[in-house]
Swiss-Prot record:
This is Transaldolase. It comes from Vibrio vulnificus (strain CMCP6). The active site is at K132 (schiff-base intermediate with substrate). Belongs to the transaldolase family. Type 1 subfamily. One of its GO terms (cellular component) is cytosol.
Length: 316
C-alpha cells in the first residue's frame, strides 16, 4: 500500500504551505502558499540573500524615498520568492497583500494590482498567481473587484461561516478556512484535546465544503492551518489542502488507508440572497472565536511584516 501522502493526492490537490524551495522540491505539490510570516522566515535563509539584494536594487530604481524603497523591496521580495517557487511547481503561487490593508478596500485593490504587475513584468501570467487577502468585509469586496479584472484571489484568515458565505457570494476563486487555529481557541477555552472527527476546525471546513457543493458555488475550498495529520485526513476529499512541510513528512512516513471524507454532492439548490454588510457583521460577530482569531491573525501578520521591513531597512 502506498503511503498516506500518495493516497491523499488521489483525493485532494495537495498544496505546500511554505516559502522554502527545498521543501517544495522534495514534496512536489501542485501549488504553494506564502504569507508575511513565511516570507519573513524564508528571507532569513542564506540561499535567498541574492533575492533580497535584487529586490533592494529594484526598489532603488523606483524611488529615492527610503520608506517607499522599503515597501517596494518587500513587495518585490515576495514576488521574487514566488517566481522561484513557480519554477518548481506546475500550479499557482499565493502571495499576500499587506495585512495592514485588511480594512482598506481601495488600498488592497491597489496593492494587489501592483503585485500582479510585478509578476506580469517578469513574464508570469495571471493564471499562475493567487492574491491572498484577509476575509474581512473590505477584503472580500476587494476580491470581488479583482476577480472581475481577471485577478484570482485566495481569501485567508477565514474562521466563520459568515466569512465563507460572503466569499462565495462575491465569486472569489478560493478560500482558505483555518483548521488548527480554530482548534487552538476551543482547546484553550475548554481545556481539553479533540479527536480529529470532533475537531471544531475540521467541523467548520466540512460545513463550508458541504454548503458550497449543495448550492453549486465554484469557489475552491482549501483547508489550511493544520496542527496534526489527523485533521488533514478527516478532510480527505476537500478541493485542496495546504500543508506545512513537517506534516507532509509525517503523511509520507505514515502507512494505512486514506478514506475519502468529503464528497462533492454536485447540488444545484436555489441560493439564498447575498448577505448585506450589516448581516455579515451580525453573523460574524455571533462567533467569538472567529472575531478573536481574525483580529489576532491580522495583527500577527502585521507584526511579521514590520519585522521584515526592519530587516530590509537595515540593508538599505
Amino acid at each position: 500500500m502506498s503511503n498516506k501522502l500518495e493516497q491523499l493526492r488521489k483525493l485532494t490537490t495537495v498544496v505546500a504551505d511554505t516559502g522554502e524551495i527545498d521543501a517544495i522540491k522534495k514534496y512536489q505539490p501542485e501549488d504553494a502558499t506564502t504569507n508575511p510570516s513565511l516570507i519573513l522566515k524564508a528571507a532569513q535563509i542564506a540561499e535567498y540573500a541574492p533575492l533580497i539584494d535584487a529586490s533592494i536594487e529594484y526598489a532603488k530604481t523606483q524611488s529615492d524615498d527610503k520608506a517607499q524603497q522599503i515597501q517596494d523591496t518587500c513587495d518585490m521580495l515576495a514576488v521574487n520568492i514566488g517566481k522561484e517557487i513557480l519554477k518548481t511547481i506546475p500550479g499557482r503561487i499565493s502571495t499576500e497583500v499587506d495585512a495592514r490593508l485588511s480594512y482598506d478596500m481601495e488600498g488592497s485593490v491597489a496593492k494587489a494590482r501592483q503585485l500582479v504587475k510585478m509578476y506580469n513584468d517578469a513574464g508570469i501570467t495571471n493564471d499562475r498567481i493567487l492574491i491572498k487577502l484577509a476575509s474581512t468585509w473590505e477584503g472580500i469586496r476587494a476580491a470581488e473587484i479583482l476577480e472581475k479584472e481577471g485577478i484570482n484571489c485566495n481569501l485567508t484568515l477565514l474562521f466563520s461561516f459568515a466569512q465563507a458565505r460572503a466569499c462565495a457570494e462575491a465569486g472569489v476563486f478560493l478560500i482558505s478556512p483555518f483548521v488548527g487555529r480554530i482548534m487552538d481557541w476551543y482547546k484553550a477555552k475548554e481545556g481539553r484535546d479533540f479527536e480529529a472527527q470532533e475537531d471544531p476546525g475540521v467541523l467548520s471546513v466540512t460545513k463550508i465544503y458541504n454548503y458550497y457543493k449543495e448550492y453549486g458555488y465554484k469557489t475552491v475550498v482549501m483547508g489550511a492551518s493544520f496542527r496534526n495529520i489527523g485533521e488533514i485526513l478527516e478532510l480527505a476529499g476537500c478541493d485542496r489542502l495546504t500543508i506545512a512541510p513537517a506534516l507532509l513528512a509525517e503523511l509520507e512516513a505514515a502507512e494505512g488507508e486514506v478514506v475519502e471524507k468529503l464528497v462533492d454532492s454536485k447540488g444545484a439548490a436555489e441560493r439564498p440572497a447575498a448577505m448585506t454588510h450589516a448581516e455579515f457583521l451580525w453573523e460574524h460577530n455571533q462567533d467569538p472565536m472567529a472575531v478573536e482569531k481574525l483580529a489576532e491573525g491580522i495583527r500577527n501578520f502585521a507584526v511579521d511584516q514590520g519585522k521584515l521591513e526592519a530587516m530590509i531597512a537595515a540593508k538599505l
